[in-house]
Amino acid sequence: MSSTGPPAKVVRSTKAVTAAKARTTKATRRSTTSATPTPDPTGEAGAGRGHGRGAGRGGGRGRGLYNRQMQRSNERWPLAASLVSWLFRHPELVLALLGKQAPIQVNGRVLNRSTQALLEVSKRLEGVTGGGDTGEGLGDPLVMRKQLQRMALIAMPIRTDVHVVGRLIPATESPEGSNGIPVRIYRRFGTGVGSGVGLGARPPAIVYYHGGGWVTGDLISHDASCRLLAAVSGCVVVAVDYRLAPEDPFPAAVDDALAAYAWVCGHADELRIAEDRVGVMGDSAGGNLAAAVALLTRKGASVPTASAVTVAPGIPAPFAQGLLYPGLSARFDSESIRIFGEGFFLTLQSMKGFRRAYLPDQADWELAAASPLLADEVDGVAPALVVTAGFDPLCDDGQAYADKLTSAGVEVEYRCYDDQVHGFFNMGILADSLALSIEVCDAMGRMMHRDDPTPTEE
């Protein structure tokens, strides 16, 4: 996209979504069941399993990007996820049974029907379980983390054409009792030396920060999403298990995010990645951290931060940044928060709870490392892929930041999926959401492979 005009808004048409859904549904019907990864603190669970047909190939389009024909043999669904996915491929039936057949329309936008069905089912399940809210907008963090891990087991198909290795890397300030920051390294089979991906036979790398309001989320909750990103983008993905609030409030997560990014940049040979093509990416709170890292390492960076956030000299700026429905301002004063702050999974009440845990000192709300949208200067930051959802309280944050970057001359690709909600990237049980997630991963892969000097064709 040109850096001189407004960012291009990509709105999904019904016809395009239907076609994408058909492709994904066809692939899902051909998938089979396999065991789900066993949770472990180092991230080594499930490493190297299930090569599947098409493993060891460089991928299509000549740049290691996603070949849709590979999806059919390399997706595996846990049995429960298969059943739930089948159910939500028939949203009209689900909505009729729940007595909620009328479509949800807000400001000219119509909520995706499968998403609406999931939303209605979730409301009823919350009514049965009680939701665990303390009344302060946030439940018990430990309970919430376990719930998110359990949900992740049925939320996404598991890519089996990806090799996964867990390890600990050095941290600026290690959590008590820890030897560093846990990470998982994802590499699609065949991605590397001799794979035909160009870039001197070394793929780009994406440092990924999970979402969860800086309070929940970990390597387990986002394992399937990171597998998908590695498989589709043709990049090596390094997922970061940064410290969480309220045990470790701001700026602990920023410190860990920056330390992990610096480590990846400094270990390109060990990781067998292109040293000049390391990007950052994250969803929700992780998008906030990705934007913060891009700001802190931008060319000529002089970003006021909390005293604990330090940037070692010589850390290069990311090659690109991917921000998926990011939260970029702690003020919570946007129009989309007012309109969509209740009833669409992420609520204003829960957002306030996350903010209270992560940013207990209100003075920190205005810092660029906590609220990148409020940064005085953004020129020189990495080219950005900014993705928002139409029914998301954080939609305006992403669009405003895309506009701000564009005005500063930064290359931006902006996509708004008008019929989606916050968190769709982790809702692979919905065919439409999975198709759009693949599209986002492909877009990030294209950005990381841009100007590839040595493209090859299969």
At which residue positions do the language-model features occur?
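Acidic, Ala/Val/Gly-enriched low-complexity intrinsically disordered segments
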Residues: 16-19, 27, 40, 45-47, ...
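Alpha/beta-hydrolase superfamily serine-hydrolase fold, recognizing
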Residues: 64, 71-88, 163-458
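A glycine/proline-hinged amphipathic helix-loop "lid/cap" segment
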Residues: 5, 40-182, 452-458
